[in-house]
A protein has these predicted regions:
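A short core secondary-structure module
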Residues: 179, 204-242
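Glycine-rich beta->alpha junctions and the first turn(s) of the following alpha-helix
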Residues: 58-70, 135, 241-318
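Internal helix-loop-helix
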Residues: 103-163, 167, 171-172, 210-216
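Short, Lys/Arg-enriched N-terminal segments with co-localized hydrophobic residues
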Residues: 43-55
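Extreme N-terminal basic, low-complexity initiation segments
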Residues: 1-16
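Short terminal hydrophobic/aromatic SLiMs and anchors at protein ends
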Residues: 18, 33-35
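A structural signal for short hydrophobic beta-strand segments in well-ordered beta-sheet cores
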Residues: 194-196
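A short, Trp-centered hydrophobic/proline-enriched beta-strand micro-motif
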Residues: 172-182
Length: 318
């Protein structure tokens, strides 16, 4: 129940504040309600809302629903809970075998244009895949490489950068990541310590999701131009880069601290326009992360329901 989950969360963070418990319970209840509403919309013959004369259609297309069925079936076969737990309980940074199968399914190429070796599908197809990956808690670098690195190149990359990296991202030959955080505190352009000068980057980024396995990173660095930041593409297999694994609360993916010492870099987009570009990139990625969370919460709700329906105590079903 939401109350039981709330108590567990409070125990983990070491507090017994009644107000916090109430907030957690209310948030969970709202999430459960939202999931129920999503289910209702999916099951309804028409998931449309009329606003005046305008009609907003929230239904997925038949092709997108077919993609959902295929993705769910694939992950049920290749990413069951026991397989996920095995990866999370080991020192492996990701499930390499599952990642290769995901690449073969073409998911890493979903929104990459056909001219760069992709499938040229829409963001909605990626939303469907994101929900199913979240449902399975798949321990692979999909979000880092697809939601962030690929999207950064699509938004800001030059023709030459796109021609070099997008085909490799689509085929799984390369894995990308995004490096913003520099430790404690909320990142801001005014307190960035990582700097870029003369085609090189120097600084430390921690934590970087999937930073230990990525081939390149999109690095947010300070700039004395424009909004105070710029984005740089840095290949991670070079002498000016060192990486160290770090532990975080997110066990579904590996994290690393990455040190850059005059590491060669390429500017992505305009110098001094990086912060606004980063915010736009993260806003788009947040939609996909939210759908992952909907998928995971929906799976948890289904498991809790099935457990409650089959659980007997004191001679009767609970």
């Amino acid at each position: 129940s939401p109350h039981a989950v709330a108590r567990a969360i409070c125990d983990v963070i070491g507090t017994s504040t009644a107000a916090l418990r109430v907030c957690v319970v209310k948030a969970l209840e709202a999430l459960v309600y939202s999931i129920a509403r999503v289910r209702d919309l999916r099951k309804a013959k028409s998931a449309k809302i009329t606003l005046g004369k305008a009609i907003m259609d929230f239904e997925f297309s038949d092709e997108q629903e077919l993609l959902r069925e295929q993705a769910r079936g694939f992950l049920a076969d290749n990413c069951p809970p026991m397989a996920v737990r095995k990866v999370l309980d080991s020192d492996a940074q990701y499930d390499a075998e599952l990642w290769q199968k995901v690449v073969e399914m073409g998911w890493t190429a979903t929104v990459i244009p056909e001219e760069f070796g992709g499938l040229g599908l829409s963001y909605l197809e990626l939303v469907v895949i994101a929900e199913e990956l979240g449902r399975a808690a798949a321990p692979i670098p999909f979000s880092s490489s697809v939601y962030l690195a690929t999207e950064a190149l699509l938004m800001l990359g030059s023709q030459e950068q796109k021609e070099k990296w997008l085909p490799m991202l689509a085929s799984g030959e390369a894995i990308g990541t995004f490096a913003l955080a520099e430790g404690n505190g909320r990142p801001a352009a005014s307190n960035l310590k990582t700097a870029a000068t003369g085609g090189s980057v120097t600084g430390r980024k921690i934590p970087v999701a999937d930073g230990g396995i990525a081939d390149f990173a999109v690095v947010v660095a300070a700039s004395n131009q424009g909004d105070g930041a710029s984005l740089h593409l840095v290949e991670l297999d070079q002498s000016g880069v060192s990486r160290e694994a770090v532990r975080t609360l997110d066990f579904t993916r590996g994290h690393a601290a990455i040190d850059f010492a005059n590491a060669q870099s390429e500017l992505l987009g305009g110098d001094g326009a990086g912060w606004a570009a980063m915010e736009s990139l993260l806003d788009r990625a947040a939609v996909l992360f939210a759908w992952e969370q909907v998928g995971l919460a929906d799976a948890a709700l289904e498991q809790a329901r099935d457990y409650a329906m089959g659980r007997y105590a004191f001679g009767r079903s609970i």
